[in-house]
């Protein structure tokens, strides 16, 4: 998994709907994030971390934010 938004939401007893309301995005968008179909921009990851009161590294693997360049 690239991000752990789903896991952290569950730990905090928060729903996808709650997160979508907080961020002003559609529940469909949040659903794509939690299933790792697509990833939110880094600014959104930071906002999600704030909302859930966790560190950014609790939400996402480092490689997602800073992918290794293919040589």
Model-derived features with residue positions:
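Residues in the helix-turn-helix
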Residues: 18, 29, 58
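DNA major-groove recognition helix of helix-turn-helix/homeodomain DNA-binding modules
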Residues: 43-58
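Recognition helix of helix-turn-helix/homeodomain-like DNA-binding domains
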Residues: 25-39
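Short basic helix-loop element that most often maps to the first helix and adjoining turn
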Residues: 3-22
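Short, charged recognition helix plus adjacent turn
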Residues: 7, 13, 32, 50, ...
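Secretory-pathway ectodomains
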Residues: 1-5, 25, 42
């Amino acid at each position: 998994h690239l991000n752990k938004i789903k896991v952290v939401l569950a730990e905090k007893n928060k729903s996808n709907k709650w997160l979508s309301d907080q961020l002003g995005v559609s529940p469909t968008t949040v659903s794509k994030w939690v299933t790792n179909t697509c990833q939110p921009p880094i600014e959104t990851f930071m906002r999600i971390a704030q909302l859930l009161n966790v560190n950014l590294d609790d939400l996402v693997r480092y490689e997602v934010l800073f992918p290794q360049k293919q040589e």
